[in-house]
């Protein structure tokens, strides 16, 4: 991360030690399909913003939340461009609609597709395989509720999508692109340089190492209320 900061600082004509002030800050736009929903988290907007701020002092992050509306996302893309976005990280509501947002306009802005591959995007950060929606009911949609059901034995396992890790990597790619730095480790997926994360099947023995360890849930959230006694019996607390 320090390397990215130093590269970008040099690009902007200032040093990490002395700093610099730009009249027009570098703008990183995050277009989320639905940043507030918890049932199937795709983007960790807070982690994304924190990562950009940690690696690029001169960057400003602007988060646009389409709330599941493709038309709203198209309007937000126009707004981001009007606000002089230097790079766009796009979590598409609908792929077909999102294709129109990629490569449009005379001054093409780099696009990093997040979660779902968008043909024509410059980069992609997502999962190796499409995530099949959980069919255990709406109460089992979030990582927390699904994990609590694994604790109680209502379900044997759950699928964990590493939204935080994906969002942090999307931030790293965006900052590197701005700096003109080489982004290593990508693989080709349908002609798009991609970083693919694994969707993990999590069982009871893996809850603390995977979910708690990665910060997806806290031990207090996992072992409170109706799951408290069960957590004590299995040695979680």
Identify the role of each PLM range:
Residues 124-136, 142-147, 162-182:
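Hydrophobic alpha-helical segments within soluble ligand-binding/sensing domains
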Residues 95-132, 147-152:
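Flexible loop/hinge segments that line or gate small-molecule binding clefts
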Residues 60-82, 136-142, 146-149:
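Structural motif
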């Amino acid at each position: 991360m320090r390397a990215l900061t130093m590269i970008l600082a040099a690009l902007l004509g200032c040093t990490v030690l002395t700093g610099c002030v730009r009249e027009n800050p570098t703008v990183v736009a995050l277009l989320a399909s639905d940043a507030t929903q918890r049932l199937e988290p795709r983007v960790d907007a807070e982690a994304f913003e924190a990562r950009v701020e940690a690696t690029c002092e001169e960057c400003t992050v602007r988060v646009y939340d389409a709330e599941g509306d493709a038309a709203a996302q198209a309007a937000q893309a126009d707004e981001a461009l009007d606000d002089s976005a230097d790079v766009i990280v796009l979590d598409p509501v609908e792929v077909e609609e999102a294709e129109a947002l990629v490569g449009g306009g005379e001054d093409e802005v780099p696009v990093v597709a997040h979660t779902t591959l968008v043909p024509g995007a410059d980069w992609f950060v997502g999962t190796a395989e499409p995530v099949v929606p959980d069919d255990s009911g709406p109460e089992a949609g979030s990582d927390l509720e699904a994990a609590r059901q694994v604790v109680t034995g209502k379900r044997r396992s759950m699928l964990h999508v590493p939204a935080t890790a994906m969002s942090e990597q999307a931030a790293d790619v965006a900052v590197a692109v701005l700096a003109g730095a080489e982004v290593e480790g990508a693989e080709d997926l349908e002609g798009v340089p991609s970083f693919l994360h694994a969707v993990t099947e999590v069982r009871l023995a893996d809850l603390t190492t995977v979910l708690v360890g990665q910060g997806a849930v806290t031990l207090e959230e996992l072992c409170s209320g109706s799951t408290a006694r069960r957590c004590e019996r299995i040695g979680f607390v």
